[in-house]
Regions:
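N-terminal lobe/hinge region of extracytoplasmic solute-binding protein
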Residues: 63-114, 237-241
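Short, well-ordered beta-strand elements
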Residues: 57-66, 118-120, 140-143, 191-192, ...
Length: 375
């Protein structure tokens, strides 16, 4: 992923480590290690622009890429949806945007058993939903039950299969109580999660929106427990527990979120609003960026990378990004049912040429799904 970004002196929203600048948490998609160039352009326009007005207005203008299909954390399946959802909903843990190490989120602390199977999370007593309701451990259990409900058909339900007996409920047709899924609310502020196996990266996994809570009364009001496409995610209906509230959503135009006064750490949220602009064309995004309409873009066209490297080498910055591009073949149909054909395609794929001449973003040729040192 390639980004264009202008530096401003505001944080986007809550960052636990107050010494860190504004940033969106880095995203984890797949398992392979990539390098991401981030371009910082300093400079202004002759007339006041969105970027120049940002210091006074305290509004971040964010190029979103594609229009999110869902803003429901249990149905979303895209980076663009992720960028909006993390402004609206907070999970049990957060992360340091520089080290990616887990930090307290809705849970102010947690305990891990010696065998690594039992995690006990202590929910903040001052954590609230945007309508003022308290955030409780029961909300998380309800949310896990919802995303694992096979009738909801969530694409990311398998992210929760690490919970003990989660598969029995999700795939084998057992009822929640009968399956005895390893998610129990001991009381309003104590949540216990039991795993099938020790999972060293479990806390990092909780940063994925599939683990985020949904407001149970709102889900029930709109009959959304096992239905897709209900209106609970529209402005005025959306109840989240994150630093921002959904204010406006014009499809393929703008998604605006405004500061949530009920957020438990609202005092550290410097921005008053974020405006996300779904702009699928990387060239259009770049023009919007250069005109001062956007603070940052979602991507950069590969055919622009060489120019930017040659003409602005001092402002291109590469950052690590986790993601994997791969080819998938139908192994049951000719010719790919023949292992020799698959091997030939594998040997004929010049990964180095692809990253140097096609993607051009400093990506690393992938020989497997997991990069060295991660698995």
């Amino acid at each position: 992923m390639l980004l264009l970004a202008k530096c401003i002196s505001l944080r986007t929203f809550h960052v636990i480590n107050h010494s860190l600048p504004w940033t969106f948490p880095k995203r984890v998609i797949g398992h392979s290690f990539w390098l991401v160039p981030m371009l910082f352009l300093l400079g202004g326009c002759t007339a006041p622009s969105n970027v120049e007005n940002a210091i006074e207005d305290k509004i971040l203008h964010f190029g979103l890429g594609s229009e999110p299909q869902y803003l429901d954390p249990h149905l979303a399946s895209s980076v663009s949806a992720h960028n909006v959802i993390i402004a609206l909903i907070e999970g049990l843990v957060s992360e340091d945007p520089k080290t990616l190490k887990p930090l307290p989120g809705v849970a102010e602390s947690w305990d891990i058993s010696e065998d690594g199977l039992l995690y006990t999370f202590h929910i903040r007593k001052n954590a609230k939903w945007s309508n003022g309701d308290p955030v409780t451990a029961h909300d998380f259990v309800y949310s896990y039950r919802r995303i694992l409900n096979p009738n909801l058909a969530s694409q990311y339900a398998s992210m929760l299969h690490g919970l003990k007996n989660a598969r029995k409920y999700h795939e084998e047709g057992l009822k929640w109580e009968e399956a005895k899924v390893g998610a129990v609310a001991i009381d309003n502020h104590t949540l216990q999660l039991t795993l099938e196996n020790p999972t060293p990266y479990f806390l990092e996994l909780l940063n994925h929106y599939s683990w985020f809570p949904a407001h149970p009364p709102t889900i029930k009001k709109f009959d959304a427990f096992e239905k897709q496409g209900t209106p609970w995610t529209r402005p005025g209906n959306y109840v989240g527990n994150g630093p921002f509230i959904l204010y406006e959503h014009k499809v393929n135009s703008v998604i605006e979120v405004k500061k949530n006064p009920n957020y438990w750490d609202a005092e550290t949220v410097s921005l008053e609003a974020i405006r996300f602009y779904p702009i699928e064309s990387a060239d259009t995004e770049e023009r919007a960026f250069r005109s001062g309409f956007l603070h940052l873009t979602q991507t950069v066209s590969p055919d622009r990378i060489d120019f930017l490297k040659q003409n602005h080498p001092e402002i291109i910055h590469f950052e690590p990004y986790l993601g994997t591009y791969f080819y998938r073949f139908n192994l049951e149909e000719p010719p790919f049912d023949d292992v020799r054909v698959r091997l030939a395609f594998n040997l004929a794929t010049d990964r180095q040429a692809i990253v140097e001449k096609v993607t051009k973003g400093g990506q690393v040729p992938a020989r497997c799904f997991t990069p060295p040192g991660t698995g």
